[in-house]
Amino acid sequence: MNFHQQFKFLNSISTHASKAIIDLHILIMRCDNRVSLSEQHHTQDIIDLLPWTDGNSKQAYYQMSVAKVRDVLANHEVEDLLQQISDVLNNQITREQLEFLTTMIVSADHVFTDAEAEVVEMLMAMQ
């Protein structure tokens, strides 16, 4: 099964859910202040697959989300952001799909940090 087929379930989500997935990606990648090149490439691959009907580009949203996540991490509001993401994704993708997605994010560079594990665990507890 190729990469595109693995993420076929993303075709049916809303733009709102696409934004939540971008936020989640950035949060997981930056929660330990370490963003590897393979994580960046992997994130770009998934972002390219996300449905998008917003007037602004995905790239513009991505940049805005990076700034938002930086604030969230600085103010220790990770749980609040995860709750928002969970609420949005709850009706859009199944828990199994979310688990698959988060696993793919954190294993992109084969370095699974405690900080990443904590974020994923908190999100799964909300679903």
Q: Language model features by range: what are they?
A:
Residues 1-127:
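Small-residue-enriched hydrophobic alpha-helices in membranes
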